[in-house]
Design a protein with these regions (language model features):
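Small-residue (GG/TT-enriched) beta-loop-alpha framework at ligand/catalytic clefts
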Residues: 121, 129, 136-222
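Acidic, glycine/GT-rich loop-and beta-edge segments that sit at the periphery of enzyme/chaperone cores
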Residues: 270, 277-372
Protein backbone atom coordinates (compact mmCIF):
# COMPACT_ATOMS: atom_id res chain seq x y z
CA UNK A 1 0.00 0.00 0.00
CA UNK A 2 1.13 3.54 -0.73
CA UNK A 3 1.59 5.30 2.60
CA UNK A 4 0.95 8.73 1.08
CA UNK A 5 -2.69 8.08 0.25
CA UNK A 6 -5.73 8.39 2.49
CA UNK A 7 -6.94 5.20 4.11
CA UNK A 8 -9.97 4.14 6.11
CA UNK A 9 -10.41 1.64 8.93
CA UNK A 10 -13.37 -0.56 9.81
CA UNK A 11 -13.42 -2.34 13.18
CA UNK A 12 -15.92 -5.02 14.19
CA UNK A 13 -16.20 -5.33 17.98
CA UNK A 14 -18.09 -8.51 18.82
CA UNK A 15 -18.89 -9.92 22.24
CA UNK A 16 -15.59 -11.77 22.53
CA UNK A 17 -13.45 -10.90 19.51
CA UNK A 18 -12.57 -8.08 17.12
CA UNK A 19 -11.71 -7.77 13.42
CA UNK A 20 -10.18 -4.91 11.47
CA UNK A 21 -10.22 -4.02 7.76
CA UNK A 22 -8.37 -1.35 5.80
CA UNK A 23 -9.67 0.39 2.70
CA UNK A 24 -8.25 2.77 0.15
CA UNK A 25 -10.04 4.24 -2.85
CA UNK A 26 -7.74 2.49 -5.32
CA UNK A 27 -8.66 -0.90 -3.85
CA UNK A 28 -11.46 -3.02 -5.24
CA UNK A 29 -12.68 -3.84 -1.72
CA UNK A 30 -11.53 -3.54 1.91
CA UNK A 31 -8.78 -5.88 3.07
CA UNK A 32 -9.23 -7.64 6.41
CA UNK A 33 -6.09 -8.08 8.49
CA UNK A 34 -5.29 -11.71 9.27
CA UNK A 35 -3.62 -12.59 12.56
CA UNK A 36 -1.72 -15.40 10.83
CA UNK A 37 0.20 -14.65 7.64
CA UNK A 38 -1.06 -16.59 4.65
CA UNK A 39 -4.30 -17.63 6.37
CA UNK A 40 -7.77 -16.12 6.67
CA UNK A 41 -7.73 -15.95 10.47
CA UNK A 42 -9.42 -12.65 11.19
CA UNK A 43 -10.80 -12.84 14.73
CA UNK A 44 -8.73 -11.23 17.51
CA UNK A 45 -9.87 -12.36 20.98
CA UNK A 46 -10.89 -9.42 23.18
CA UNK A 47 -8.44 -10.34 25.92
CA UNK A 48 -5.28 -8.74 27.31
CA UNK A 49 -2.39 -9.84 29.50
CA UNK A 50 -0.57 -7.13 31.44
CA UNK A 51 2.86 -8.35 32.46
CA UNK A 52 4.16 -6.97 35.74
CA UNK A 53 7.32 -5.70 34.06
CA UNK A 54 5.20 -3.49 31.79
CA UNK A 55 4.69 -5.42 28.56
CA UNK A 56 1.10 -5.79 27.31
CA UNK A 57 -0.09 -8.68 25.14
CA UNK A 58 -3.28 -8.77 23.10
CA UNK A 59 -5.51 -11.44 21.59
CA UNK A 60 -3.96 -14.85 20.98
CA UNK A 61 -0.64 -13.76 22.52
CA UNK A 62 -2.50 -12.87 25.71
CA UNK A 63 -4.32 -16.23 25.73
CA UNK A 64 -0.97 -18.05 25.62
CA UNK A 65 0.00 -16.33 28.88
CA UNK A 66 -3.38 -16.62 30.61
CA UNK A 67 -2.14 -18.89 33.43
CA UNK A 68 1.25 -17.24 33.94
CA UNK A 69 1.78 -15.75 37.43
CA UNK A 70 3.86 -12.78 36.27
CA UNK A 71 0.92 -10.61 35.23
CA UNK A 72 -2.84 -10.10 35.08
CA UNK A 73 -5.19 -11.57 32.47
CA UNK A 74 -8.34 -9.71 31.41
CA UNK A 75 -11.11 -11.13 29.23
CA UNK A 76 -14.45 -9.88 27.90
CA UNK A 77 -12.97 -6.40 27.61
CA UNK A 78 -15.83 -4.89 25.63
CA UNK A 79 -18.55 -6.38 27.82
CA UNK A 80 -16.62 -5.36 30.92
CA UNK A 81 -16.38 -1.76 29.72
CA UNK A 82 -20.13 -1.69 28.96
CA UNK A 83 -20.93 -2.85 32.48
CA UNK A 84 -18.75 -0.10 33.95
CA UNK A 85 -21.19 2.51 32.64
CA UNK A 86 -23.18 2.12 35.86
CA UNK A 87 -20.29 1.43 38.23
CA UNK A 88 -17.58 3.51 39.89
CA UNK A 89 -14.57 1.75 38.38
CA UNK A 90 -13.19 2.51 34.92
CA UNK A 91 -10.53 -0.20 34.61
CA UNK A 92 -12.14 -1.84 31.58
CA UNK A 93 -12.69 1.55 29.95
CA UNK A 94 -8.94 2.05 29.90
CA UNK A 95 -8.28 -1.48 28.69
CA UNK A 96 -10.80 -1.13 25.88
CA UNK A 97 -9.28 2.18 24.72
CA UNK A 98 -5.86 0.53 24.75
CA UNK A 99 -7.20 -2.41 22.73
CA UNK A 100 -8.78 -0.18 20.07
CA UNK A 101 -5.56 1.83 19.82
CA UNK A 102 -3.68 -1.41 19.27
CA UNK A 103 -6.10 -2.48 16.55
CA UNK A 104 -5.62 0.78 14.65
CA UNK A 105 -1.85 0.39 14.89
CA UNK A 106 -2.09 -2.85 12.90
CA UNK A 107 -2.15 -0.58 9.83
CA UNK A 108 1.63 -0.38 10.18
CA UNK A 109 1.87 -3.94 8.83
CA UNK A 110 0.91 -2.43 5.48
CA UNK A 111 3.37 0.46 5.67
CA UNK A 112 0.64 2.97 6.43
CA UNK A 113 1.78 5.91 8.53
CA UNK A 114 -0.16 8.68 10.18
CA UNK A 115 -3.78 8.64 11.25
CA UNK A 116 -6.56 7.16 9.11
CA UNK A 117 -8.98 9.59 7.48
CA UNK A 118 -11.80 7.89 9.35
CA UNK A 119 -12.30 4.92 11.66
CA UNK A 120 -15.71 3.23 11.82
CA UNK A 121 -16.52 0.89 14.70
CA UNK A 122 -19.46 -1.50 14.43
CA UNK A 123 -20.97 -3.29 17.43
CA UNK A 124 -23.88 -5.76 17.74
CA UNK A 125 -26.24 -3.26 19.39
CA UNK A 126 -25.75 0.50 19.59
CA UNK A 127 -27.26 0.90 23.05
CA UNK A 128 -26.97 3.99 25.24
CA UNK A 129 -24.13 2.27 27.10
CA UNK A 130 -22.32 1.44 23.85
CA UNK A 131 -22.71 5.01 22.57
CA UNK A 132 -21.28 6.45 25.80
CA UNK A 133 -18.36 4.01 25.74
CA UNK A 134 -17.48 4.70 22.10
CA UNK A 135 -17.69 8.44 22.69
CA UNK A 136 -15.22 7.94 25.53
CA UNK A 137 -12.91 6.01 23.20
CA UNK A 138 -13.09 8.81 20.64
CA UNK A 139 -12.19 11.39 23.25
CA UNK A 140 -9.28 9.37 24.66
CA UNK A 141 -7.85 8.68 21.19
CA UNK A 142 -8.18 12.37 20.32
CA UNK A 143 -10.33 11.80 17.23
CA UNK A 144 -12.98 14.24 16.08
CA UNK A 145 -16.60 13.26 15.54
CA UNK A 146 -15.91 12.92 11.81
CA UNK A 147 -12.73 10.90 12.32
CA UNK A 148 -14.26 8.15 14.47
CA UNK A 149 -17.83 7.07 13.81
CA UNK A 150 -19.85 4.12 15.03
CA UNK A 151 -22.79 2.01 13.95
CA UNK A 152 -24.55 -1.27 14.69
CA UNK A 153 -24.32 -4.55 12.80
CA UNK A 154 -27.43 -3.79 10.75
CA UNK A 155 -25.90 -0.62 9.31
CA UNK A 156 -22.54 -2.23 8.54
CA UNK A 157 -24.44 -5.07 6.80
CA UNK A 158 -26.26 -2.41 4.77
CA UNK A 159 -22.98 -0.70 3.85
CA UNK A 160 -21.39 -3.94 2.72
CA UNK A 161 -24.45 -5.03 0.72
CA UNK A 162 -24.91 -1.92 -1.39
CA UNK A 163 -21.25 -1.76 -2.35
CA UNK A 164 -21.68 -5.11 -4.14
CA UNK A 165 -22.88 -5.66 -7.69
CA UNK A 166 -26.57 -4.87 -8.19
CA UNK A 167 -27.58 -8.43 -9.09
CA UNK A 168 -27.02 -9.37 -5.43
CA UNK A 169 -29.56 -6.87 -4.10
CA UNK A 170 -32.34 -6.88 -6.68
CA UNK A 171 -34.71 -8.05 -3.92
CA UNK A 172 -34.31 -8.27 -0.14
CA UNK A 173 -30.94 -9.35 1.24
CA UNK A 174 -30.55 -11.56 4.31
CA UNK A 175 -27.77 -12.20 6.80
CA UNK A 176 -27.57 -14.81 9.53
CA UNK A 177 -24.99 -14.01 12.20
CA UNK A 178 -24.08 -16.92 14.48
CA UNK A 179 -21.46 -16.45 17.20
CA UNK A 180 -21.35 -18.50 20.40
CA UNK A 181 -24.97 -19.25 21.26
CA UNK A 182 -26.30 -16.02 19.75
CA UNK A 183 -28.07 -16.34 16.40
CA UNK A 184 -29.33 -13.19 14.68
CA UNK A 185 -31.19 -12.56 11.44
CA UNK A 186 -31.07 -9.32 9.46
CA UNK A 187 -33.20 -8.64 6.38
CA UNK A 188 -32.62 -5.53 4.29
CA UNK A 189 -35.65 -4.01 2.55
CA UNK A 190 -35.03 -1.45 -0.18
CA UNK A 191 -37.53 1.18 -1.31
CA UNK A 192 -36.65 3.22 -4.37
CA UNK A 193 -37.17 6.97 -4.21
CA UNK A 194 -36.71 9.78 -6.70
CA UNK A 195 -33.12 10.51 -5.67
CA UNK A 196 -32.27 8.12 -2.84
CA UNK A 197 -33.11 4.47 -2.20
CA UNK A 198 -34.31 3.98 1.38
CA UNK A 199 -33.22 0.83 3.20
CA UNK A 200 -34.44 -0.58 6.51
CA UNK A 201 -33.46 -3.74 8.38
CA UNK A 202 -35.78 -6.28 9.95
CA UNK A 203 -34.15 -8.13 12.85
CA UNK A 204 -34.77 -11.32 14.82
CA UNK A 205 -32.63 -12.86 17.55
CA UNK A 206 -32.41 -16.29 19.18
CA UNK A 207 -30.40 -17.81 22.03
CA UNK A 208 -29.57 -21.33 20.87
CA UNK A 209 -29.51 -23.96 23.65
CA UNK A 210 -26.04 -25.41 24.28
CA UNK A 211 -27.36 -28.94 23.78
CA UNK A 212 -28.29 -28.00 20.20
CA UNK A 213 -25.16 -25.94 19.39
CA UNK A 214 -22.90 -28.94 20.00
CA UNK A 215 -24.91 -31.43 17.93
CA UNK A 216 -24.69 -31.00 14.14
CA UNK A 217 -27.95 -32.76 13.21
CA UNK A 218 -29.94 -30.97 15.90
CA UNK A 219 -28.41 -27.65 14.88
CA UNK A 220 -29.30 -28.24 11.24
CA UNK A 221 -32.89 -29.07 12.20
CA UNK A 222 -33.13 -26.04 14.50
CA UNK A 223 -31.68 -23.70 11.88
CA UNK A 224 -33.95 -25.09 9.16
CA UNK A 225 -36.94 -23.97 11.18
CA UNK A 226 -35.34 -20.55 11.70
CA UNK A 227 -34.87 -20.21 7.93
CA UNK A 228 -38.51 -21.15 7.25
CA UNK A 229 -39.75 -18.60 9.78
CA UNK A 230 -37.42 -15.85 8.59
CA UNK A 231 -37.92 -16.26 4.85
CA UNK A 232 -41.70 -16.57 4.89
CA UNK A 233 -43.39 -14.18 2.43
CA UNK A 234 -40.10 -12.54 1.37
CA UNK A 235 -38.43 -12.40 -2.04
CA UNK A 236 -34.72 -12.69 -1.25
CA UNK A 237 -31.82 -12.35 -3.67
CA UNK A 238 -28.83 -13.16 -1.48
CA UNK A 239 -28.09 -14.76 1.90
CA UNK A 240 -24.92 -14.25 3.93
CA UNK A 241 -23.83 -16.64 6.69
CA UNK A 242 -21.46 -14.88 9.08
CA UNK A 243 -19.75 -16.09 12.25
CA UNK A 244 -17.94 -19.03 13.80
CA UNK A 245 -21.24 -20.80 14.43
CA UNK A 246 -21.40 -21.83 10.77
CA UNK A 247 -18.07 -23.68 10.92
CA UNK A 248 -18.30 -27.35 10.07
CA UNK A 249 -20.30 -29.08 7.39
CA UNK A 250 -23.66 -29.11 9.15
CA UNK A 251 -25.69 -26.86 6.78
CA UNK A 252 -27.55 -29.60 4.91
CA UNK A 253 -31.31 -29.49 5.41
CA UNK A 254 -31.00 -25.75 6.02
CA UNK A 255 -29.62 -25.15 2.52
CA UNK A 256 -32.39 -27.27 1.01
CA UNK A 257 -35.00 -25.18 2.83
CA UNK A 258 -33.29 -22.00 1.66
CA UNK A 259 -33.87 -23.03 -1.97
CA UNK A 260 -31.83 -22.76 -5.15
CA UNK A 261 -33.01 -19.34 -6.33
CA UNK A 262 -30.77 -17.38 -3.95
CA UNK A 263 -27.06 -16.60 -3.90
CA UNK A 264 -25.33 -17.72 -0.71
CA UNK A 265 -22.03 -16.62 0.85
CA UNK A 266 -20.24 -18.00 3.91
CA UNK A 267 -17.61 -15.93 5.73
CA UNK A 268 -16.43 -14.15 8.86
CA UNK A 269 -15.45 -10.60 7.94
CA UNK A 270 -18.52 -9.05 6.29
CA UNK A 271 -19.20 -6.63 9.14
CA UNK A 272 -15.68 -5.25 9.45
CA UNK A 273 -15.62 -4.73 5.67
CA UNK A 274 -18.97 -2.96 5.86
CA UNK A 275 -17.58 -0.67 8.56
CA UNK A 276 -14.57 0.11 6.35
CA UNK A 277 -16.91 1.02 3.49
CA UNK A 278 -18.79 3.25 5.94
CA UNK A 279 -15.62 5.01 7.10
CA UNK A 280 -14.92 5.87 3.47
CA UNK A 281 -18.48 6.60 2.32
CA UNK A 282 -19.47 8.82 5.26
CA UNK A 283 -16.27 10.85 4.91
CA UNK A 284 -17.35 12.06 1.48
CA UNK A 285 -19.44 15.22 1.01
CA UNK A 286 -21.28 13.88 -2.02
CA UNK A 287 -24.63 12.17 -1.54
CA UNK A 288 -24.73 8.40 -1.90
CA UNK A 289 -27.69 6.81 -3.65
CA UNK A 290 -28.71 4.83 -0.56
CA UNK A 291 -29.98 5.86 2.86
CA UNK A 292 -30.21 3.54 5.86
CA UNK A 293 -32.94 4.33 8.35
CA UNK A 294 -33.06 2.91 11.87
CA UNK A 295 -34.03 3.98 15.37
CA UNK A 296 -30.80 5.88 16.05
CA UNK A 297 -31.22 8.05 12.95
CA UNK A 298 -33.06 11.37 13.23
CA UNK A 299 -36.52 10.79 11.79
CA UNK A 300 -36.98 14.23 10.32
CA UNK A 301 -35.58 17.68 9.67
CA UNK A 302 -36.12 20.57 12.04
CA UNK A 303 -35.87 24.10 10.66
CA UNK A 304 -36.19 27.43 12.48
CA UNK A 305 -37.83 30.33 10.68
CA UNK A 306 -35.80 33.54 10.81
CA UNK A 307 -35.87 36.96 9.20
CA UNK A 308 -32.74 38.07 7.38
CA UNK A 309 -32.42 41.32 5.44
CA UNK A 310 -36.18 41.78 5.43
CA UNK A 311 -36.98 38.33 4.03
CA UNK A 312 -38.13 35.14 5.75
CA UNK A 313 -35.83 32.15 5.66
CA UNK A 314 -34.95 29.00 7.58
CA UNK A 315 -31.89 27.62 9.31
CA UNK A 316 -31.42 23.87 9.77
CA UNK A 317 -31.29 22.74 13.40
CA UNK A 318 -31.62 18.98 12.85
CA UNK A 319 -30.63 17.04 9.73
CA UNK A 320 -32.78 14.03 8.87
CA UNK A 321 -30.83 10.79 8.88
CA UNK A 322 -27.97 11.92 11.07
CA UNK A 323 -27.24 9.88 14.18
CA UNK A 324 -29.13 11.35 17.14
CA UNK A 325 -26.01 11.31 19.31
CA UNK A 326 -24.01 13.50 16.91
CA UNK A 327 -23.28 17.12 17.76
CA UNK A 328 -25.86 19.60 16.46
CA UNK A 329 -25.09 23.23 15.53
CA UNK A 330 -25.87 26.19 17.75
CA UNK A 331 -26.71 29.70 16.57
CA UNK A 332 -26.73 33.19 18.01
CA UNK A 333 -29.85 35.11 16.97
CA UNK A 334 -31.15 38.58 17.70
CA UNK A 335 -34.71 38.97 18.95
CA UNK A 336 -37.06 39.78 16.09
CA UNK A 337 -39.69 41.72 17.99
CA UNK A 338 -42.25 38.94 18.47
CA UNK A 339 -42.15 36.34 21.27
CA UNK A 340 -42.96 33.52 18.86
CA UNK A 341 -40.72 30.80 17.54
CA UNK A 342 -41.78 29.05 14.35
CA UNK A 343 -40.42 25.60 13.57
CA UNK A 344 -40.88 23.51 10.44
CA UNK A 345 -40.84 19.75 10.89
CA UNK A 346 -40.29 17.55 7.83
CA UNK A 347 -40.59 13.87 8.66
CA UNK A 348 -38.86 11.18 6.64
CA UNK A 349 -41.39 9.74 4.21
CA UNK A 350 -44.05 12.41 4.87
CA UNK A 351 -45.47 14.29 1.91
CA UNK A 352 -45.98 17.58 3.79
CA UNK A 353 -44.14 19.54 6.44
CA UNK A 354 -45.70 20.58 9.73
CA UNK A 355 -45.39 23.95 11.43
CA UNK A 356 -45.05 24.36 15.17
CA UNK A 357 -45.55 27.74 16.90
CA UNK A 358 -43.88 28.23 20.28
CA UNK A 359 -44.35 31.32 22.41
CA UNK A 360 -41.74 32.74 24.77
CA UNK A 361 -42.74 34.35 28.05
CA UNK A 362 -40.89 36.24 30.77
CA UNK A 363 -38.30 37.80 28.48
CA UNK A 364 -35.29 39.53 30.08
CA UNK A 365 -35.95 43.08 31.23
CA UNK A 366 -33.95 45.11 28.71
CA UNK A 367 -34.53 46.81 25.33
CA UNK A 368 -35.73 44.43 22.61
CA UNK A 369 -32.86 45.45 20.35
CA UNK A 370 -30.46 44.13 22.99
CA UNK A 371 -32.04 40.68 23.28
CA UNK A 372 -29.84 37.96 21.87
CA UNK A 373 -30.33 34.23 22.23
CA UNK A 374 -28.21 31.15 21.71
CA UNK A 375 -30.35 28.38 20.22
CA UNK A 376 -29.70 24.68 19.71
CA UNK A 377 -31.80 21.57 19.14
CA UNK A 378 -30.56 18.71 21.35
CA UNK A 379 -31.81 15.22 20.44
CA UNK A 380 -32.81 12.71 23.12
CA UNK A 381 -33.29 9.96 20.53
CA UNK A 382 -34.34 9.70 16.89
CA UNK A 383 -37.76 11.29 17.40
CA UNK A 384 -37.51 13.50 20.49
CA UNK A 385 -35.68 16.81 20.55
CA UNK A 386 -35.27 19.55 23.14
CA UNK A 387 -35.11 23.03 21.64
CA UNK A 388 -32.96 25.04 24.02
CA UNK A 389 -32.71 28.83 24.11
CA UNK A 390 -30.51 30.73 26.50
CA UNK A 391 -30.08 34.46 27.08
CA UNK A 392 -26.70 35.30 25.55
CA UNK A 393 -26.45 38.82 26.90
CA UNK A 394 -25.37 41.65 24.63
CA UNK A 395 -21.64 42.16 24.60
CA UNK A 396 -20.38 44.52 27.29
CA UNK A 397 -23.68 46.39 27.47
CA UNK A 398 -25.90 43.77 29.09
CA UNK A 399 -24.92 40.63 30.94
CA UNK A 400 -26.87 37.44 30.43
CA UNK A 401 -29.83 37.06 32.77
CA UNK A 402 -29.09 33.33 32.96
CA UNK A 403 -32.58 32.48 31.74
CA UNK A 404 -33.05 29.29 29.77
CA UNK A 405 -36.08 28.11 27.80
CA UNK A 406 -36.54 24.47 26.81
CA UNK A 407 -39.18 23.23 24.36
CA UNK A 408 -39.92 19.52 23.82
CA UNK A 409 -40.36 18.81 20.11
CA UNK A 410 -41.53 15.50 18.62
CA UNK A 411 -40.40 14.77 15.07
CA UNK A 412 -42.97 12.00 14.73
CA UNK A 413 -45.97 14.13 15.71
CA UNK A 414 -49.20 13.50 13.87
CA UNK A 415 -51.73 16.09 12.79
CA UNK A 416 -52.30 18.88 10.31
CA UNK A 417 -49.91 21.37 8.83
CA UNK A 418 -50.15 23.85 11.69
CA UNK A 419 -49.87 22.90 15.33
CA UNK A 420 -51.39 24.74 18.27
CA UNK A 421 -49.37 27.40 20.05
CA UNK A 422 -47.52 26.41 23.21
CA UNK A 423 -46.36 28.87 25.85
CA UNK A 424 -43.07 28.41 27.65
CA UNK A 425 -41.45 30.44 30.37
CA UNK A 426 -37.84 30.10 31.50
CA UNK A 427 -36.65 26.65 32.55
CA UNK A 428 -37.05 25.99 36.24
CA UNK A 429 -33.85 27.05 37.93
CA UNK A 430 -33.15 29.91 35.49
CA UNK A 431 -32.82 33.30 37.09
Amino acid sequence: MDQKKEFYVGIDIGRDRAMISLYREDQKEPETISTVRGMEKFGIPLVMFLEKKGTTYYGDEALKRKEQPNGDFFEDIYEGALQEQTEETTLYHGLFVQFVRRLIRLKERYGLKGDPTCVAITVPVLSQQAIALLQYVRQELDFSEKELIFMDYAESFFLHTYHQEAVLWQHDVAMFYFQGAELSFYLLHRKSGLKVQFVTAEQKHWQVPESICTHAELMDEYFSNVVRESFAKHAISTVYFVGDGFDGNWLRESLRVMGTNKRGFLGKNLLTRGAAYGAWRYSKPETWGFFFNCEYKMQGELDLRIESQGADGFIRLIEAGQNWFCQTPSFKLLYGGTPEIVLKISRIGAANSQVLHLELTDLPDRPEAALRFRIQAIPKNGTEVTLRLSDDGFGGFFKSSGKIWEFPVALDMEGGSTMEKARYGPKKGGR
